[in-house]
Amino acid sequence: MLEPVSTAQSLWSFGLWILVILSPVLFFASRELGILNAKKRFAKNGFEEVLAGLRKSDVFGLMTINGPKIVLAPKFAQEIRSNPALSVSAFSSSELHAHIRGFDVFRQGEADDILQDTVRSKITQSIGDLIQPLSEECSLTLKPKWTDSPEWHEVCPHTTILDIIARLSSRAFIGDELCRNPKWLRLTVDFTVDSFRAAEALNWWPYALRPLVARFLPSCLKLHKYIQDADNMMKPVLESRRQAQAKDPQKSYPDTIQWFEETAQGRPYDPVRLQLTLAFASIHTTADLVIQTILDLCSAKNWDELCRSLREEIISSFREEGWRKPLLAKLKIMDSALKESQRLKPVSIVGMGRIAKEAVKLSNNTIIPKGTRLLVSNTAMWDPEIYPDPRTYDPYRFLRLREASENESAGQLVSLSPTHLSFGLGKHACPGRFFAAAEVKIILCHILLKYDIKLADGCKPKPLRAGTNLVADPTAKLLVRRRQEEVAL
């Protein structure tokens, strides 16, 4: 005969049943809570976490906003630079959620090959032809931003330089049909910012839920509108060019709309998405270098003397070359100052992102499992054994390096080195660095010859830290006044 079950036993059994059913949910929730807390720590202190990790080991794990990664010391840069088992494209796609609708503009594949090939074979080779048009755009854009007032007045370099870079880049990327269109310029600037914001918003969600969440997050939905707006603005330009070239097959345009078509050679691609990807990859990083260099120069104790040296270099070089490519090569003090600013404040303390497509064994016998995401630390740029007095801004540092070396390219802004990873290393290094270097030098020529500049009263610029990223102080202010340039630019 069965004994009746007591109320206490029933409750205990029910509770046990509930626990069994809910335990996977509770485990998942507790796990995600732990991950969420780690992500919050990274967002606030990612910079310090990398430095702390390197003090303990040359290889360590780091929970980032977009999940776990392995960080390597700078000494590993050479051995992973071109390792075929480590994928750059897979890493980029993962970081930017390219598998999710709305982020598919960042999907790697044949279109990305077209983009990379265009930058290397067309943009870089056309820099000499682009210098004069870029200078013209700089004159047209700088004047309304900084004015012709001979009195000291305040400007915000963060917003004004960003707009100037967007204008110059668009002149080379999309031609004069859209490069002066305020809506297009605003779109190219805002698309980058909002893409990062949307990607970061998704990063806080569990990976499996992200495709669903992206359908409702306002920041993600905004990306669809950018793509549609860009499509609406570009379609008339593309159609007009098709009609013009149908009438005159020899008609050509010196910009990436034309160059993408030539490079593709029949391969499928979306010209609108390629333009957005190009803007995403170039405008903000180039502007950040210009802004940081100006802030560093103005903060230098010997700024007056340094400014005279820079101006003399620009004037003598311009009188010899005009707006021709050799001019840029002769601006050696400027080149050194730019590279020093990039050394002191890179855009991130880590770089060279990769995903292991198969297990990889490092030189110290560490095994990197398949599927692992890797980053390489940039901290060699602050190593006193490599750069004496590394925390001091020395605008002549790389000029001395060039003068002391038998290799003329040593220490140039665009040169690559495992001790200076701002542009990466190896075949996957930034292909647009030559164009970016030309842009920033053209802009600095105009600014230094046309304006007296100094930091606004009380302004002490300090880079903004966000995770492992470093951004030139967006709150910094300058005082500027128009001066008469010694040569007509």
UniProtKB/Swiss-Prot annotation:
Protein's name according to its UniProt entry: Cytochrome P450 monooxygenase trt6
EC class: oxidoreductase
Cell location: Membrane
Binding site for heme: C430
Major localisation: membrane
Gene3D superfamilies: Cytochrome P450
Glycosylation sites: N364, N407
Enzyme nomenclature, EC number: 1.-.-.-
Similarity remark: Belongs to the cytochrome P450 family.
Effect of loss of the gene: Impairs the synthesis of terretonin but accumulates terrenoid.
Keywords: Glycoprotein, Heme, Iron, Membrane, Metal-binding, Monooxygenase, Oxidoreductase, Transmembrane, Transmembrane helix
MF terms in GO: heme binding; iron ion binding; monooxygenase activity; oxidoreductase activity, acting on paired donors, with incorporation or reduction of molecular oxygen
Signal peptide: none
InterPro entries per record: Cyt_P450, Cyt_P450_CS, Cyt_P450_E_grp-IV, Cyt_P450_sf
Swiss-Prot/TrEMBL GO biological process terms: secondary metabolic process; terpenoid biosynthetic process
Pathway noted in the entry: Secondary metabolite biosynthesis; terpenoid biosynthesis
One GO cellular component term noted in the UniProt record for this chain: membrane
Record field: transmembrane: 10-30
Cofactor: heme
Pfam name, any one: p450
Species of the source: Aspergillus terreus (strain NIH 2624 / FGSC A1156)
This protein's record includes keyword Cell membrane: no
